[in-house]
């Protein structure tokens, strides 16, 4: 398969690009230049790998979920344990890389957006480590849902700005973070949390997250002597999925499945299934599939999981959908909750609600596969942050 994206202008087919105001163009170009240089620099790579190993705790295990496999009665199910990273999710793979980039560029301050709070915590963590000032924008609704993570960020020395505009969720936090970056661009680096935003952000985040798929490939081959038949990951903006999928894109015998949040159901208005129900538009500096009405107004995304309710999706996922290399599906709040409970009871692993969407789809897929086939789920984060809201949800039902 001939796949080489993005092109030099940052496009993935028709998607991606740089839809930014003139005031940001210089910074985006400066970032691209610095990133290219860093990727060629052995000392930078060495420092990054040092922190990934000794600070983040990589490599993360590829765990054979024997009980879950028996329960499903089909393919062997493996879990890529990104929940075991420092800070409890895949997010830190990217924040550590970008924070080192910020230091390299001579920036003193970092700004970021966060939904579930995981990216905010991972950003505040690396800022504490590297002595950078940290400002995090978070939607008012998410601040309410994720009080513990807000406290964590503040403990780590970050300033958390609550955003009341719009629906008070991730999209609004990104708007404010971008605004802040425009006016502080001389001394501030923006750590985008997913494969979104203007080029080179989707590429930078994908590349830093690709450690997930690269490790998985090596680990699976060592265990089974071949590549897995299927790989499953959840998708909000899509960074854990992109990090998992990208190293497998050329291996056409490996089926790739991206799982979005169907919320209350894709037939309702309450979902975040952008690739299932969206249409093409521009948001936050990039062309991608979006949830929008006929007038092009962005619609609110809904999911029980704060990390999946973004109304867009990374430009590279948009392309991978169009060319059919990845097959995208959606899972409802109910199905995700069932999977959350099942994995917890069967394996003693409490997954994040985001990751539970991937688990839920894998539970449908595994029984349709042969017993000698293998399926890998990207377990993108741990569920500690969700236990409280799940308890509330179950009491209400």
Swiss-Prot record:
Enzyme class: lyase
Key words of the record: Amino-acid biosynthesis, Aromatic amino acid biosynthesis, Lyase, Pyridoxal phosphate, Tryptophan biosynthesis
Cellular-component GO terms for this entry: cytoplasm
Catalytic activity: (1S,2R)-1-C-(indol-3-yl)glycerol 3-phosphate + L-serine = D-glyceraldehyde 3-phosphate + L-tryptophan + H2O
Keyword Amino-acid biosynthesis: yes
Pfam families: PALP
GO molecular function: tryptophan synthase activity
Organism superkingdom: Bacteria
Listed SUPFAM superfamilies: Tryptophan synthase beta subunit-like PLP-dependent enzymes
N6-(pyridoxal phosphate)lysine sites (modified residues): 91
Record Gene3D superfamilies: 3.40.50.1100
Cofactor: pyridoxal 5'-phosphate
Enzyme Commission number: 4.2.1.20
Biochemical pathway: Amino-acid biosynthesis; L-tryptophan biosynthesis; L-tryptophan from chorismate: step 5/5
NCBIfam families per the UniProt record, alphabetical: trpB
PANTHER family reported in the protein's UniProt record: TRYPTOPHAN SYNTHASE, TRYPTOPHAN SYNTHASE-RELATED
Family assignment from sequence similarity: Belongs to the TrpB family.
Function of the molecule: The beta subunit is responsible for the synthesis of L-tryptophan from indole and L-serine.
Description of how the protein assembles with itself and partners: Tetramer of two alpha and two beta chains.
Protein name: Tryptophan synthase beta chain
Organism: Bacillus cereus (strain B4264)
Gene expressing this chain: trpB
């Amino acid at each position: 398969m001939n796949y080489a994206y993005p092109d030099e202008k940052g496009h993935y087919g028709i998607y991606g690009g740089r839809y930014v105001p003139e005031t940001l163009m210089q910074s985006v170009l400066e970032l691209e230049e610095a990133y290219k240089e860093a990727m060629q620099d052995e000392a930078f790579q060495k420092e990054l790998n040092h922190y990934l190993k000794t600070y983040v705790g990589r490599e993360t295990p590829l765990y054979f979920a024997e009980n879950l496999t028996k329960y499903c009665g089909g393919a062997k199910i493996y879990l890529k344990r990104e929940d075991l990273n420092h800070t409890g999710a895949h997010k830190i793979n990217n924040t550590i890389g970008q924070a080192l980039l910020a230091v390299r560029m001579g920036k003193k301050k970092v700004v970021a957006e966060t939904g579930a709070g995981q990216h905010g915590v991972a950003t505040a963590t690396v800022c504490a480590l590297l002595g950078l000032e940290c400002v995090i924008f978070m939607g008012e609704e998410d601040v309410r849902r994720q009080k513990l993570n807000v406290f964590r960020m503040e403990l780590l020395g970050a300033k958390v700005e609550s955003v009341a505009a719009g629906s008070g969720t991730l999209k609004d936090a990104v708007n404010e973070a971008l605004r802040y970056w425009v006016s502080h661009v001389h001394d501030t680096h923006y750590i985008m949390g997913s494969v979104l935003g203007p080029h080179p952000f989707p590429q930078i985040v994908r590349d830093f997250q690709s450690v997930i798929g690269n490790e998985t490939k090596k680990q699976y081959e060592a265990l089974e002597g071949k590549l897995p038949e299927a790989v499953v990951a959840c998708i909000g903006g899509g960074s854990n999925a992109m990090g998992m999928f990208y190293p497998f894109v050329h291996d056409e015998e490996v089926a790739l499945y991206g799982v979005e949040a169907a919320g209350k159901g894709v037939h309702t208005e309450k979902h975040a299934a952008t690739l299932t129900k969206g249409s093409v538009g521009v948001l936050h500096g990039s062309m991608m599939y979006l949830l929008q009405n006929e007038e092009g107004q962005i619609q609110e995304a809904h999911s029980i999981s704060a990390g999946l309710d973004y109304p867009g999706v990374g430009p590279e996922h948009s392309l991978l959908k169009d060319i059919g290399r990845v097959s995208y599906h959606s899972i409802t709040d109910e199905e995700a909750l069932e999977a959350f409970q099942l994995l917890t009871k069967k394996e003693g692993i409490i997954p994040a609600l985001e990751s539970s969407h991937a688990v839920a789809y894998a539970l449908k897929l595994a029984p349709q596969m042969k017993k000698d086939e293998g399926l890998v789920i990207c377990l993108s984060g741990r569920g500690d942050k969700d236990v409280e809201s799940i308890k509330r949800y179950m009491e209400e039902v």
